[in-house]
């Protein structure tokens, strides 16, 4: 920070396991990536190339190297995993991760329907090669998963080898953890937190109101994902009570 402002909440320093900010990239250029790193690299930890966008990006290896050289981890969106898995190309997917020198991968089932046991088998196999994040929740806003099932699946996926479980929201913030209006399913989140350690969860929260809600509930070191690159610094101000929405939380 540029100024000495007293009594701000403590933020974990990078590299960190909690207080993560995960940025979503939907097709930025090399120059845009350089600009993001220059302006904000100290405030985010990992970047996801959303859904299957990595299949269409120019200079993909160069983009990955840019972020890794800035100590920012990179992974492909879970939908890319699903695209390979549903076509019985799981081994091809592993080969791609190796070819692109990725140490992190996401396993999800938001667009495909597979038995949860099979999903956990994928997690177990993949965790032998890379660190695994796994995503819970459907991309279909009409599909409401009850809290007990979220908890059961999160626990099973962590036991299978996931390092973190991700609460689905999409980049729009209106499915999974949230109602179609973007409002948080508060009872769901609170019930999950009675059973699953908060440091094991990344909450997708692309909208400011959602970010504010999670910071107020869990604190400045809540793990948040699907953050737009141009909102990284904005989120950091929310985390430490230097934006109006959380200004009085940490005085």
Residue ranges and their predicted role:
Residues 36-40, 67, 96-97, 125-126, ...:
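Generic structural signal for hydrophobic
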Residues 4-10, 191-251:
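C-terminal alpha-helical cap/extension of soluble enzyme domains
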Residues 18-24, 45-49, 74-78, 105-107, ...:
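Hydrophobic faces of well-ordered beta-strands that scaffold small-molecule active sites
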Residues 31, 54-67, 83-92, 110-130, ...:
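Active-site-adjacent beta->alpha loops and helix N-cap segments on the catalytic face
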Residues 26-39, 59, 85-97, 146-156:
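Short, acidic/polar
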Residues 17-31, 50-53, 75-89, 135-149:
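Active-site mouth loops of central-metabolism enzymes
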Residues 104-111, 159-174, 221-245:
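Glycine-rich phosphate-binding active-site loops on the catalytic face of alpha/beta enzymes
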Residues 1-66:
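Conserved N-terminal beta1-alpha1 strand-loop-helix module at the mouth
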């Amino acid at each position: 920070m540029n100024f000495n402002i007293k009594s701000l909440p403590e933020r974990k320093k990078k590299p960190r396991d909690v207080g993560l900010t995960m940025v979503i990239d939907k097709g930025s250029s090399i120059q845009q990536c350089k600009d993001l790193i220059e302006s904000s690299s100290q405030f985010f930890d990992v970047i996801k190339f959303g859904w299957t966008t990595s299949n269409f990006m120019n200079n993909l290896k160069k983009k990955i190297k840019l972020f890794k050289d800035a100590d920012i981890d990179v992974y492909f969106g879970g939908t890319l995993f699903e695209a390979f898995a549903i076509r019985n190309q799981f081994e091809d997917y592993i080969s791609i991760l190796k070819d692109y020198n990725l140490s992190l991968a996401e396993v999800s089932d938001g667009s495909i329907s597979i038995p949860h046991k099979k999903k956990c088998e994928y997690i177990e196999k993949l965790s032998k090669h890379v660190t695994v994040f796994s995503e819970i929740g459907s991309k279909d806003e009409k599909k409401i998963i009850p809290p007990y099932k979220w908890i059961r699946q999160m626990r099973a996926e962590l036991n299978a080898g996931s390092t973190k479980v991700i609460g689905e929201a999409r980049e729009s913030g209106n499915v999974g953890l949230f109602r179609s209006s973007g409002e948080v399913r508060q009872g769901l989140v609170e019930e999950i937190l009675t059973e699953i350690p908060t440091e094991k969860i990344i909450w997708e929260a692309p909208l400011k109101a959602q970010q504010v809600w999670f910071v107020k509930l869990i604190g400045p070191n809540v793990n948040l994902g699907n953050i737009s690159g141009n909102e990284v610094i904005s989120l950091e101000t929310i985390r430490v009570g230097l934006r109006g929405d959380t200004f009085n939380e940490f005085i």
